[in-house]
C-alpha cells in the first residue's frame, strides 16, 4: 500500500492476491487499484478503481511495491514461480494503466520485500532472509528465530544500457519495510528484533560506486514491525506490524480455506465456525525525532496490520492487513 506525495489517491495491491501456500493451487494474479479517498461520500464503485496492467502476461505474486511519483514509476516485487524479481511499470493515473517497462533480475535481489525508490532507475530493496523457506526450511527457521544479521539491504541501479547494477549496502536481521525519511536517512524495519534501524546515507564517491549506509540509531517497538511509510504533511515515520505471533501464524495458515469461498463451502460446520471466529491483533505507531514512539492503533478489531499511511492535510489514515479483506480507515 502506498500513498503519493501530492495525489489524493491511495495505491494498493489487492489484499486477496495470494497466501503463498506451498503445494496449493495459485490464486489469480495480484491486481492493482487506485482509491480516491478525498471524498468519503463516494460509493466504492466510484472511488475504488482497478488499474489495468499492460504488456505483462507473466505471473504476478507481490508482497510490496513503491511508487516514484515524479517519474510515474511503479516498482513491484514479484515472487512468481518463474523466480523472484522486481517488475517496473509506468503508472498513468489519468488512464488508470500500468505499462510494463522491464523485469529487474539480479542475484542480489533474491527475496525482495520492500522498496524505497530514489528515482525511476534507482532504489533500495530489502531481502527479508538470506535463506529461503522453500529451499532451506531449517536454516530459514534458525535465521528467523535467532535473529541472525545476515539478510541484506541492496542498492540497485538500472544503467542507461539496461544493465542491472546492484550492491549490498547493509546486513541486518529480517529486513522488512524500508523508506527514505529524507536524503540522508534510510529507515529499515528489523522484524525479528522488534526494532527499526535508522541508517545515515553517504553519497557515492563517483558514478561507478554505490552509496554507503551507516547505522546511526534504532528504536524498539512492542510488536514485530512490517512496513514503513512517511506521513504526508508532517514527515513522521509510520510503522505497522504484528503484536501476537501465535495468532498471526494460525490466522495465516487458515486463509487457504477461509479466504476461498469454494473451498470453505465444502467444509463442515466446525471449519466454517473456526473461520468466523479466528482473529489476530494489529498495531500501528508513529515515530518522530523529537517525540519518539507514539501509538496510533492497537486492537483485535482488524487483523494482520502490515502497512499504515496517513494524509495529515486531508485528516485521513489507512491501515492495510496482510491477510485482511478490506482496509481500516480513520478520519480525524
Describe the residue ranges of each PLM region:
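Residue-level signature of beta-propeller blades and closely related beta-rich strand-turn architectures
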Residues: 6-7, 38, 71, 80, ...
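Blade-edge beta-strand/turn elements of extracellular beta-propeller
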Residues: 42-56, 94-108, 154-177, 197-198, ...
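Beta-propeller domains
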Residues: 1-53, 92-97, 327-329
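Blade-level signature of beta-propeller repeat domains, shared across WD40, Kelch, NHL, RCC1
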Residues: 245-246, 305-332
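Short, conserved, GDST-rich strand-edge loop motifs in beta-rich repeat architectures
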Residues: 2-26, 77-79, 126-147, 241-278
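Beta-rich, blade/repeat-based domains predominating
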Residues: 27-30, 54-69, 105-123, 130, ...
